[in-house]
Every structure is written in structure tokens, then in C-alpha cells.
Amino acid sequence: MSAEGYQYRALYDYKKEREEDIDLHLGDILTVNKGSLVALGFSDGQEARPEEIGWLNGYNETTGERGDFPGTYVEYIGRKKISPPTPKPRPPRPLPVAPGSSKTEADVEQQALTLPDLAEQLAPPDIAPPLLIKLVEAIEKKGLECSTLYRTQSSSNLAELRQLLDCDTASVDLEMIDVHVLADAFKRYLLDLPNPVIPAAVYSEMISLAQEVQSSEEYIQLLKKLIRSPSIPHQYWLTLQYLLKHFFKLSQTSSKNLLNARVLSEIFSPMLFRFSAASSDNTENLIKVIEILISTEWNERQPAPALPPKPPKPTTVANNGMNNNMSLQDAEWYWGDISREEVNEKLRDTADGTFLVRDASTKMHGDYTLTLRKGGNNKLIKIFHRDGKYGFSDPLTFNSVVELINHYRNESLAQYNPKLDVKLLYPVSKYQQDQVVKEDNIEAVGKKLHEYNTQFQEKSREYDRLYEEYTRTSQEIQMKRTAIEAFNETIKIFEEQCQTQERYSKEYIEKFKREGNEKEIQRIMHNYDKLKSRISEIIDSRRRLEEDLKKQAAEYREIDKRMNSIKPDLIQLRKTRDQYLMWLTQKGVRQKKLNEWLGNENTEDQYSLVEDDEDLPHHDEKTWNVGSSNRNKAENLLRGKRDGTFLVRESSKQGCYACSVVVDGEVKHCVINKTATGYGFAEPYNLYSSLKELVLHYQHTSLVQHNDSLNVTLAYPVYAQQRR
């Protein structure tokens, strides 16, 4: 059975420093089991940022080693099903010529390819095929400043070049061979590979980028991403990297060898792409791809970044005068189960050293996330919990989250990560929030609620409209790309017909000239002209469609930008509206009045509440408070009940309660926090003085504002129907 995992590619060489580490070589492919990251408390999406994870434990597919490696030394490739390896089929191998038979150069040209696939030529720690490395080193040593390099053909024939390539890499001496022969052997090597260095699978995407993206900077970034994609096997990627470094080195001395990026791309793009496999109409676009790859310095290796720290275990935790025995729930900087968006809002425009702690998004018991402001950005640091100890990384040494935070309020986090040279200076206090509601009377607050709700609805409608346009445009772009491919095939068919007709027309025209049959000659010429005209029409239609596609692709990106710019406003408006609504609810404003300010007429809306009813069964706590019942008993009590049926029980989490409610026919559970400010499902909503007050509020207010999967109200106490 296969398991899910993630693949990474090594960007730098790393020599292991500890027994549990593994060596890395540039281009190595590594696999990490998803379960190992989940066990450490990382959520979906974080695997794409290995530098934030720190040290990963995985398997080096290139060397066969298993162990720890630094996340700062690798890049994320994508997901992968991990299963037992299957033997890779060998490429076709040519039959040897029978002894005594003679072969001409033409015979050699027709011979099947002699070189093995790139995947079979590389073995760690090679950064490219050994034969290719030897050729390039010899060429750079002899001909780096040669003005005729790669442009003058040597006197060697094809058979001699292939004989050179067939030699044993270790024994062959290239010192005495002319540089032009080496250059021709280099070209022949690229042509004799079973598959081009740049696989045909990425041709169409490269061409689409060249046609659709107008910004050169954006084009380079997208091209980099495509070149590093899993579509290019890592042996091919390493070879391409090596070739680009060679071409870049040649272009650096173009004043002497006359080989600038453009000239090199014109010479080698047919060999790297194999134009016979691509449309000749796209030749210029493919040349442009190679020119950009050579011209930009993205392929040059940067110095390796700092290793993620493995801090030594502290001998003792200094007593800093703070209360390490304080409950986490009472800590002003602990916000419980709030979203990342809310955290970003609270830390917006704050000073370096501002911080807060929330529950980890993985919901694993005991794991938390510290969000710290550093360098104008939010840094997310996982707080791990194992065997009663807490910490940022192994070994875990602190007895509580409070003790951990207090330690780093006096000590720099550079102990943990050299890039985080800052202390936890300014806690974002849940007790000293900015007063959002500035007005001092109910009527004024109600008017502001109406204003914010109107703005929120307008923004929501705008976002929905953009989303529909985004989806429609995406579908149209795909249809146009398909149509362009169909045009290309149609043009190819018509051109073949045109060539066939042209070939046979010459014979018939000569025949009819001898016979003096002018009418038949005119008919043949007329048919030929009609065919050429039809080809021109199709080419014009394709050109217009390509122009439309380019414009629509630009619109598509603009829509995406606008949607992303609206999201923060939408979140902030909803948050502000909810705070005004909560203020009014706490002041005892009746629901009918709230509905007027919210403009609600549909009673099914989450804010359109039923009329206040003094006879609600919710007033009797015995109808819903079941005391110390556990999760299984709660599910048995609620099984088969209608949506909105609920109960409240004591939670396994010390000092808290749990609410169990039926949603879409299933029983869901959520924690009710008990804090110094009151009961609630999450900050800043822990404001209800009793469980009864909380239940009465959510009798008419949906839980969806706290959890998207809980679109339900606490409508029916579990024992209410039995008591009627």
C-alpha cells in the first residue's frame, strides 16, 4: 500500500555533522513521509516551506540514505505517493553490426542512438554525466576565447565523433584533440541522447508563457518555476543546470569568442528542444527561452544559507521574576483557537518583538504556534509538546508554554534561530484590546452596525462577482489554448496538402502545356490558390486568437490581484461588524431591532433571529447540561436527532467544557473556553458570564463564525423534547 509523502530537491551540498544526519549533493531528490510531519504538528501547506520546518527526516532517493537534513538546503517539489520502487525499463539498445560488414557514414547516421538515457548516466555525487563534464572542461580549457568555437565544423566525420563518445570516460585523453573536434563531439552528444535535455512535456507551457506574459521580470520568474517543476526529472534538471553554467561562462567572454546569449541560444536550442518534435512556428519562442535562461544569473549557485539550529539542552531555566506557574488560559498573550487571518490583523503595523500565542492549526493536543513580529513580517514558530515538555525543537526542555515564553522574554530567540535576533518584548494582550466600538449609546452603535454591514455586503458581492469572472475567464483561456492547438494541427494538414498538390501540379501543368490545354492549367492553379488562401485565413484566425488569449491572460492575472486585495478588507469588515453586533447583544438589545439595523427579512439568515421567547427550554439547564459525560456517551445521546440538537458536557481539557451538536446528520464537538473574561468558543468572544448565557446567544446565532463546518445554531436541547 502506498503512503503520501513530499518530495524535495537539494539546492546545496551538505556534509553531515551528526550521526543521524545524511549528506546532500546538489540535485539530490529527497522524500519525506507526510506522517512524520503530522506527528510533529505541522499542517497541510507548511511542507512547501521547509526552511520554516527546520530539520526534516527523510529518504535520499539519489544516495539511498535515510536521516535528518536541513530544510534551508532544499526546495519543495510536490506531493508523491511512496511505494516500493519498481525497476525502470531500459531504453532500446542498438544491435551491433555483423563482423565483416562495411558501413558508410550514411549508415552511421541512420543507426539507432548509442548513448544511454540521462537517468542512467548520472550517479551521486555527479552533477552532470561524466562524459559531458570531461568534454566541457576540455573545451573551456582550450577554447574559451576561440572566435570560431561551435560555429566551425571540424574535419572529423560522424563515425569518428561517435567513436570518441563511445570511449571509456576514465581512460580517454582529450588533451591532444583539437577544440573544434571536441565542440562537434559536444553537439553530437546532445543529439545522440535518446531524449532531449528539455523534455517535450514542458514545450507547450514554455511557449504559452512566451506568448501570454508581457512583463520580462514576471516571465523570468514563471520560467524559473517551470524549469524547477517535477515535469523535468532531476537527472535532466542537473544536466540542464550544468549546460547553462557552461553557456553563461562562454557568454562572459563574448567580446573574444563572439558567443553572446542570443548566438548560443540559436546554436543550441534545436539540440536542447529537438525542434522536430515541436512546431517550427514556435522556434523563435524556444530560442527566447534558452536566451533568457543563459542571460539571467538564476542558475548560479548562491552561498549556502545558515543551518537550522539544533540548540543544546539548557542546564537550567533562569528565574526571570515572572510567574512560570500561571495558567496558560490566564496568560494575556494566549489567544486560544483564533485564525491566522485574525493573528495577522492583530500584529499589523506593530513593532519588532510583538507576539502572541495561539492553538496550532493542526489541533494536536498540546501544540501551539508563536507568532512574532520581526523585520516587518510575521514569523510563525511551532511550539512542540511531548512527554510533558515544551520547546521549539528537540530537545524539549520547558515544563510549560508559560515558562518557555517567559524565558524568551529575557533571552533572544537567536539561541533558537540566528535570524531571529529579537526578544519577546510586546505581548498582544487579550485583556487590553483596542476599543472598536467608540460610540456611547445604543442608537449610534446600531447606525454604525448598519453602515459596516452594508459595506461588508457590498464587498462580498464584489468578491463574488470577481470570483465568477475569474472562473469564467479561466475556462475561456483553456478553451482558447485548445483551439490554438487545433489550429496548429489544421495548418499542418493543409500545408502537407499544399506541398503534395504543388509536387503533382508541376507534372500535370507540364503535361497540359504540351497538350495546349490552358483550361486545365487554370483549374489547377485556381485550386492551388484557393488552398493557399485558406491556409492564410486559418493562420490569421490563429493569430487573432493568440492576441485575444494574451489579453485575456493579462485580465485573468489582474482579476486574481483584485480578489487578493479585497480579501483583507472583507475579513476586517466582518470582524468589525461582529464586534458591534456582540456589543449590542450584551447590552440586551432585542433581536427584532438588530434585524432592522442588519436589514434582515429572511429569518433563515444567521443574524435574522427568532422572536425572543421567555418559554425557551434553553432556560432550564437540565435540558442540555449533562455534566461529566464523555464523547461516546454524547454521540449516543444525539444519534438520530435533528440538526441543531445539542448538549453541553465537561471537557477532558482541564477547566473547560465541550458542546456536542448535530450538523448535517453528524455529531460535531467543539471546546467551550472558560477564561477570566467569561465563557466562549474563541477569543475575543469569551465574554459570556455563564454557560446559560452562551447557550441562549447561540440559540439564534450560528456557530459558523467560529468554524466553517458548523453552520448551525444551538436550537434544540437534547432533553427538551422528552420534557414537553
Curated annotation (Swiss-Prot):
Presence of keyword Acetylation: yes
Superkingdom field: Eukaryota
Residues making up the signal peptide according to the UniProt record: none
Residues covered by the Rho-GAP domain: 113-301
Residue ranges of domain SH3 in the record: 3-79
Gene Ontology cellular-component terms listed: cytoplasm; cytosol; nucleus; phosphatidylinositol 3-kinase complex
PTM annotation (Phosphotyrosine): residues: 467, 580
All copies of domain SH2, residue ranges: 333-428, 624-718
Bias (Pro residues) ranges: 84-97
Residue(s) at site: Arginine finger: 151
Keywords of this entry: Acetylation, GTPase activation, Phosphoprotein, Protein transport, Repeat, SH2 domain, SH3 domain, Stress response, Transport, Ubl conjugation
Chain positions with Phosphoserine modification: 154, 279, 608
Residues passing through the membrane, by range: none
Keyword Cytoplasm attached: no
Gene3D superfamilies: 1.10.287.1490, Rho GTPase activation protein (1.10.555.10), SH2 domain (3.30.505.10), SH3 Domains (2.30.30.40)
List of residues that carry N-acetylserine: 2
Disordered: region residues: 80-109
Free-text note on domains in this protein's UniProt record: The SH3 domain mediates the binding to CBLB.
Quaternary structure annotation from Swiss-Prot or TrEMBL: Heterodimer of a regulatory subunit PIK3R1 and a p110 catalytic subunit (PIK3CA, PIK3CB or PIK3CD). Interacts (via SH2 domains) with CCDC88A/GIV (tyrosine-phosphorylated form); the interaction enables recruitment of PIK3R1 to the EGFR receptor, enhancing PI3K activity and cell migration. Interacts with phosphorylated LAT, LAX1, TRAT1 and LIME1 upon TCR and/or BCR activation. Interacts with CBLB. The SH2 domains interact with the YTHM motif of phosphorylated INSR in vitro. Also interacts with tyrosine-phosphorylated IGF1R in vitro. Interacts with CD28 and CD3Z upon T-cell activation.
Function text: Binds to activated (phosphorylated) protein-Tyr kinases, through its SH2 domain, and acts as an adapter, mediating the association of the p110 catalytic unit to the plasma membrane. Necessary for the insulin-stimulated increase in glucose uptake and glycogen synthesis in insulin-sensitive tissues. Plays an important role in signaling in response to FGFR1, FGFR2, FGFR3, FGFR4, KITLG/SCF, KIT, PDGFRA and PDGFRB. Likewise, plays a role in ITGB2 signaling.
PANTHER family the UniProt entry points to: PHOSPHATIDYLINOSITOL 3-KINASE REGULATORY SUBUNIT, PHOSPHATIDYLINOSITOL 3-KINASE REGULATORY SUBUNIT BETA
The protein's name in its UniProt record: Phosphatidylinositol 3-kinase regulatory subunit alpha
Classification of source organism: Eukaryota, Metazoa, Chordata, Craniata, Vertebrata
